[in-house]
């Protein structure tokens, strides 16, 4: 086998491989002989079909199969000999073959050589937060509001009330599509409507008719309404005030707490909030570390890996919307290109961190991750057993653990400053509510 390597552009490589033609002919003849023994052709006894007949009927297909096998086998031997690391499947094209040699060209991309830099320049503001008694009380108040009942109130509407309204919206005196409703129920303070709408209802009583002036946000989804001033004619038909449940043993039972009453409920709430806080703190630091790593290391990305990641994201998008990929038009690659490129780049860089620091997955960490995730379920032991019995899920958790270890390794060389933050403020930002 003779091999020549050519760098065409970027990460693309072209291997020209030639092997003795007799290798092809030998394998073709062996395959034809095997086919002759089992061929069933009218006019000939089994095993007695002349080779010329077998060759005429099956020769082209057999030669194609043999050629494919020869190319694949010699390609693997060539990349091992040349110490190349393909980042995707090759494409094979025939070369300048003759009676003495069979030549083909394999074109493919290789993984980039990653040399990490700027790790000591990564800046991380590490948030520090705790779940306080006030945070637990605030969560209980939220739960009370979620389980409130509503009764008609003979007073003016205020924050937290539910109102039932009829409304008609207009821009420049013209009604617009989607701007009209009857019997529409709205909780004041929910933020469901555009700015100023809910505020304009406060202070009015059932039976009143009035108008409010608002402006649609510039980022509003309807193109024809972005930034437009609008007027809404409103009829307020009902005002319903919230009745919050008392915090007692019966309230605790609503959340599955049958023993220990309110104190047990508070303990359970604190445990859940602490778990969510820990996850959010980790995610915040990880994002900062990854962003710093990406900013300091610009590497060329194999198109094959990006295309593969786009396909994964495309399938996930279809699944999220409950669709069947076979029955849906293919979502354009542009929708996922930026995210795919980031994921590929992060994967390559973290892979180099793991390699250069010789990290090995910590099984104790894997089990801790599974236990933390399982604690959110009704029967944690059952979830833990299920994960430990599923090879694919366990491999996923090992990957998560190893990625955590890589981030921690990067954190050791980063410039880290700590910042005390309040639970509510931090969690609101983490969940996009701020």
Curated annotation (Swiss-Prot):
Its EC number is 5.2.1.8. Disulfide bonds: none annotated. Belongs to the FKBP-type PPIase family. Tig subfamily. Signal peptide: none annotated. It is found in: Cytoplasm. This is Trigger factor. GO terms for molecular function: peptidyl-prolyl cis-trans isomerase activity; protein folding chaperone; ribosome binding. Keywords: Cell cycle, Cell division, Chaperone, Cytoplasm, Isomerase, Rotamase. The keyword Membrane does not apply. It catalyses: [protein]-peptidylproline (omega=180) = [protein]-peptidylproline (omega=0). Residues 160-245 form the PPIase FKBP-type domain. The keyword Thylakoid does not apply. Its main location: cytoplasm. Transmembrane segments: none annotated. GO terms for cellular component: cytoplasm. Consists of 3 domains; the N-terminus binds the ribosome, the middle domain has PPIase activity, while the C-terminus has intrinsic chaperone activity on its own. It comes from Shewanella amazonensis (strain ATCC BAA-1098 / SB2B). HAMAP family: Trigger_factor_Tig. Involved in protein export. Acts as a chaperone by maintaining the newly synthesized protein in an open conformation. Functions as a peptidyl-prolyl cis-trans isomerase. One of its GO terms (biological process) is 'de novo' cotranslational protein folding.
